[in-house]
Amino acid sequence: MKNFFVSALAAVMTLNVSAAKKPTARLQFEALKGVAGSVEMPRGRVNYTAFTKLYYVTNVEDTTYQYMNVFVPEGASQQSPIILKTNVGGYMPSAAGNPSVGDITGMALQRGYVVAIVGSRGRTSYVTKGKKKIYNGKAPAAILDLKAAIRYLRHFDKQMPGDAEKIITDGTSAGGAMSALMGAAGNNPAYEKYLKAMGAADERDDVFASICYCPITDLSHADMAYEWLYGNTDSRKANDTAHRQVSQELAALFPAYINSLGLKKKDGTLLTANNYLGYIKEELIRSAQIAKDAGAEIPDSIGFTFNSDAGTFAPVNGGMPDLGKLPRDMAKNLKRDGMPGGMGKRVGEYITDLDMTKYLNYVANKTPLKTAPAFDALGVSGNEASGENDEFGDVNNTPANFTDYSAGKNGTTVSAKVKEEEYLLNPMEQIGHEGITVAPHWYIRHGSIDRDTAFPVALNLATKLENTGKDVNFLLAWNRPHSGDYALNELFNWIAEITK
């Protein structure tokens, strides 16, 4: 008994010393500490119970960000799906917030879903030790925090309302990349050493579905994809000689990459550099046709061609049947392919072609293109470094190159540390690999006028997921810039379908 008390006292003293050195938080959930709240929605007030500042690791390094807030609407149960929202943008730190009428969270509560808004560290977050700033939010901190939050929800699944086997992640831009990672990197052992050191729960971290708006991902190949797509636009041709050369050199690297992926279209056609632009064109035409059928005016001045009887504008709804009245399998094919199998095109109703040169110039004129290279700057000091260079920086806040091309131009090589971080931040490198659990359901959107990253980034992600048997709802959303959480009624109809 004496030894027991001595050991207990020693443990308490150790705990107090540790607490003095670094903030700590117990991994706990107290069901009786919920606070009543509400959010005003267009259709009325939604009441909820809020559980705030739920620290999802025991070794908390940053008390500003490493926790989440969970909101349980009236009527929710243990079976209610959980919407996990990340507000990460630009790979910056993201605080756990409150539900909003302006994004997925408000409507999720209105529809009876539990909402978890997760805070996470980012590339500019730091803690102070003595007089020194330690930047502890560089890659892969954000995805580690988010994975730890998933483990927390699963750890307390029986105590908390909501079904931890029905977690649906949502994010936009870099947050879209985080959502893609949560969906693509479930239970990957490569993260385990980090999560263990953080004091994350010893649980699975796979999820049920991922919603990814304009994901800024596959950073290792994003520069080459960007220049391959936009390198022949008038904007790029107007650049100085040095930047034109960079653009051309990067564009020349993309064919080998796309050929190496072995991606296939739905009909089994192998995608290569020779037919990939046509693949993008098909997706843009599909998006424009959906918009036209809903009543949007699609001008021929941006590159579209309509059959001769249609003139400039096709008829509203284009003679297309109501999707809600079709069998589910036919409606699904219609959404993806533009018309159900066996239904031929009717005269005057369909977009027939798209001049990609004209269309890409249109996109570049809507919003100026990024300077080449778009992501991994040739100079990585001071203002020359990109946000992505900063993301791969070190604890001293020194940015780093992360591609062989830009590192080579700077006379250096990509370090082993950065290569590991690249892998941990890239869903494309994890999908389809043994020992990793990929979410079965995906909702991926990239705007048809979004030039923040090139169309192939999101399209490759969607195609690779489809090729590995996942359920993917993908669209180059018509006339959408770089943005997220739009067309929420459509999104929640999809959520209702996959969770019923």
Regions found by a protein language model. Give the residues of each.
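Primarily recognizes the serine-hydrolase "nucleophile elbow" in alpha/beta-hydrolase
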Residues: 155-232, 422
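N-terminal cap/lid segment of alpha/beta-hydrolase-fold proteins
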Residues: 23-78, 412-424, 433, 464
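Hydrophobic h-region of N-terminal signal peptides that target proteins for export
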Residues: 10-18
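Mobile cap/lid helix-loop segments that gate and shape the active-site cleft of serine hydrolases
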Residues: 52, 185-196, 201-204, 276, ...
